[in-house]
Amino acid sequence: MKKLLLLTAILSSGLYAASIDHIQTYSPDYLANQAQTGMINGVSAYYNPAGLGRLEKGKYFHVGFQFAHGHEKMSYKEKEHKAKLNQAIPNIALTFVDNKGATFFNFGGLAGGGKLQYDGVSGVDVLTDLAQFKLLGIYDKGSSLTGSNKYEQITLGRAFNIDDKLSFSIAGRVVHGTRKLNGSLNIGVNPTAQYRQEKAQQVAQEVSRAVDAATQGKGLSAAQIAAIKTQKTNEALAKLQKRVTDLTQNGLSGDIDSKREAWGYGFQLGINYRVNDKLNLAARYDSRVKMNFKAKGHEYQLQTTDILGQTIGLSTFYPQYTINSKIRRDLPAILSVGASYKITDNYLVSGIGNFYFNHQAKMDRVTTFGEHQHGRDYKNGWEIAIGNEYKLNDKFTLIGSVNYARTGAKNSSFNDTEYALNSVTLGGGIRYQYDESLAITASVAHFIYKGAEGNFKEKYGVTENQKYKKEITAVGLSITKKF
């Protein structure tokens, strides 16, 4: 396991997720054809394990490599923040086919998101419009946020042939996940005259009450008490003026470096029914994986107790990253069904439908800044895909597909660290059959995401929502070798 986890230095999955966290790009072959569940081929260890026993007897080794390039953007009013994405993703699978079925093993990315670095975020931009911050005249002096979510999975299982048509599979899954948040808050402050006046009045009232309480029953005259109040008030106002001057000159700063980590375990069930030489039907169920993430690291919050009544940091807005917290974020169960049909000896079509049980999973159910609830408003997600494979000759096969996905994420779940957008994916590729035992597949996919708005208007009472967009293109290369 430790050796496999060394691969995570270059493995970051979920770059083009079809659901909240989950991906389906377990292999580069998926980029070319996103309708894999009903097919039987060299990548069935990922998509249709129950069908592996229908392959020719032998040992199969599959290795793949994907590279994704693109960008993600968030904006609020006239301020836009953009993060570039460049990420590599490897995968590996081993399959041993015998007369009774097949034993399979695979390792690769399962869920999460690529590493993104923003030079500011909309969650900071909106603070200038909030009533509790407006009089302070706060503004961003150069805050930054970097986040990454990575999940790796090992699957080990067995496929059993019942007869020449029906087969099923069962497997165990081990999942490791890390979710990181690293950022700095650099906030400028330019208090308004109204703030200074109201704060001075507040200080004077607090001093007066404190002196009254301290001198009660001491036998002091009214003049003596008044003199004490004047002295204490002047001292407090001088201290306030010094604090305001410091805020104006230096602003406020804070940072966080939080790493959440968890292990989870699950199972996988599959069934395959070969109707005839042309039509194949299959289904796969991946169980929910319970993951209890514990956060480690450090955080320094903005020292704002004297001006706001509390300290504020990035964990105020993203409490799931609070140091030493332990919060559930499960991977939802998946049900995938698919079919493939060989129209001619050279032309095969396939289709799939995936259903994500998001509503049954606990995903970062926390209370954020302003007593707003997060993680309780996910709907179930789904996607459909159609694929085509046309054999040009004995050596080359053209591949193409289209996918439509709805993640199930409501706009109330969107924030700077997480926004799962609905998408359309166009994929294509070519497979080169070097000989009967070696196939090489080159693939490409372009992910077209539907831009969406968040819920700042509802959440904070401002006049405009934040907006999210992203665009990603991925290329891949895989090799499948039969021994």
What are the language-model segments listed below?
Residues 15-118, 122, 131, 142, ...:
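N-terminal, post-signal peptide beta-strand-biased segments of exported outer-membrane/organellar beta-barrel
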Residues 61-69, 105-109, 170-174, 283-287, ...:
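Transmembrane beta-barrel strands of outer-membrane/channel proteins
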Residues 53, 94-98, 160, 269, ...:
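Residue-level signature of outer-membrane beta-barrel architecture
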Residues 100-103, 165-168, 278-281, 346-349, ...:
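Repeated loop/turn-to-beta-strand initiation elements of outer-membrane beta-barrel proteins
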Residues 43, 84-90, 150-154, 263-267, ...:
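Residues that define the transmembrane beta-barrel architecture of outer-membrane proteins
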Residues 119-141, 180-257, 293-324, 361-374, ...:
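Solvent-exposed loop segments that connect transmembrane elements
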Residues 430-432, 438, 469-483:
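Outer-membrane beta-barrel "beta-signal"
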Residues 270-274, 278-294, 324-408:
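Detector for outer-membrane/organellar transmembrane beta-barrel domains
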